[in-house]
Curated annotation (Swiss-Prot):
Gene Ontology MF, one: proteasome binding
Top-level taxonomic group: Eukaryota
Region annotation (Disordered) ranges: 34-65
Keywords: Cytoplasm, Nucleus, Protein transport, Transport
Family statement drawn from the similarity comment of this UniProt entry: Belongs to the cut8/STS1 family.
Pfam family, one: Cut8
GO BP: nuclear protein quality control by the ubiquitin-proteasome system; proteasome localization; protein transport
Source organism: Meyerozyma guilliermondii (strain ATCC 6260 / CBS 566 / DSM 6381 / JCM 1539 / NBRC 10279 / NRRL Y-324)
Name of the protein this chain belongs to: Tethering factor for nuclear proteasome STS1
Assembly: Binds the proteasome.
Protein transport in keyword set: yes
Localization annotation: Cytoplasm; Nucleus
Length: 317
């Protein structure tokens, strides 16, 4: 058998080829028909399902809220002016104390700018320091014992320190109002009387020193009223010192100053004797000057009598 020889007739091959191709087309058409029927059936089933089931309403799409842009805000410390405004008295006092400790050069500026403390406020502050001493005394112990003294010693030192500072601020030339100075000194001296009489020798020495210094400040304050430049000017222009002394004597009498000093002198065992002598001498000086002024006035009236009528009557006789 020769290679490549075709044993089947060509007609047979053509008919067979056509037959195969026709079968393929027939099968293809049959597949398309079945596929179409299947698709239509499935679509029919879907449509039937859609008719039988209630259609749910489409949900409303959720709108995304737009983010509002806000300015960036961060916390910050209070301004110094607000800090001073909202702080209580104790906190403000501690703040100033720390400031003066860190910057002592600020003290001069504060003294220049701060207003003059009122007498009432100064006395209240001093009273608070005194109350600290009394409040820290032991309950189940002798008040005058060494134990009691040692327990309140820090508060006693604070009281005496405050007393010293305030006393100096009420002396001339810082305080030129004599009545203000004497009112303060009278209150301070009364507080010294009220201190517990501790038997401790250190306290007894401190108390004696306090009385001596207070007596000296009484003399300084009272002498300022006598040596005041305004009073000296009035006395020189009117040639009557009694005019200036009259105001001082009136202050002494209105405030019952001599009786107060005598009480202080009794409680301090004679420490205010010189103060009493000075005040009494001022009153005596005023009275003597007033008497001499009245006598001079009467003598002047005698020399100013008009004798013209008497002389005329004598000439007629």
């Amino acid at each position: 058998m020769a290679t490549g020889y075709n044993w089947v007739p060509e007609k047979y091959l053509e008919s067979k080829s056509k037959h195969k191709y026709g079968d393929i087309l027939q099968k293809s058409d049959s597949f398309k028909h079945d596929l179409g029927n299947s698709f239509r059936k499935r679509r029919h089933d879907d449509d039937y399902g859609k008719v039988g089931k209630p259609q749910s309403q489409p949900t409303r799409p959720i709108q995304r809220s737009k983010r509002i842009k806000t300015p960036k805000i961060i916390g910050q410390a209070l301004p110094v002016s607000r800090v001073v405004e909202v702080l209580d008295h104790r906190s403000l006092q501690q703040l100033l104390t720390k400031l003066l400790t860190i910057h002592p050069e600020v003290a001069t500026t504060i003294n220049k700018l701060s207003p003059r403390p009122e007498l009432k406020d100064c006395l209240e502050t001093l009273r608070e320091r005194f109350d600290e001493i009394i409040n820290h005394l032991p309950y189940k112990c002798d008040v005058e014992s060494d134990y009691s003294y040692l327990r309140v010693k820090p508060h006693l030192n604070e009281f005496l320190s405050c007393l010293s500072d305030l006393t100096l601020s009420f002396l001339p030339p810082i305080e030129v109002n004599t009545l203000q100075s004497l009112t303060f000194l009278d209150y301070v001296t009364s507080l010294i009387h009220q201190l517990p009489n501790f038997a401790n020798t250190e306290f007894q020495y401190t108390k004696v020193q306090a009385y001596d210094q207070l007596a000296n400040t009484w003399i300084i304050a009272f002498n300022h009223s006598l040596n005041d430049e305004d009073c000296q000017e009035v006395a020189s222009t009117k040639d009557a010192k009694v005019e200036s002394l009259s105001k001082i004597v009136k202050m002494i009498e209105d405030n019952d100053l001599i009786n107060k000093l005598e009480k202080h002198n009794d409680l301090s065992q004679g420490k205010f004797r010189m103060v009493i002598e000075l005040v009494k001498a001022t009153v005596d000086n005023y009275e003597s000057l007033s008497e001499s002024l009245r006598a001079k006035s009467l003598l002047g009236d005698m020399f100013t009598v008009d004798y013209s009528n008497f002389v005329a009557a004598q000439s007629l006789n």
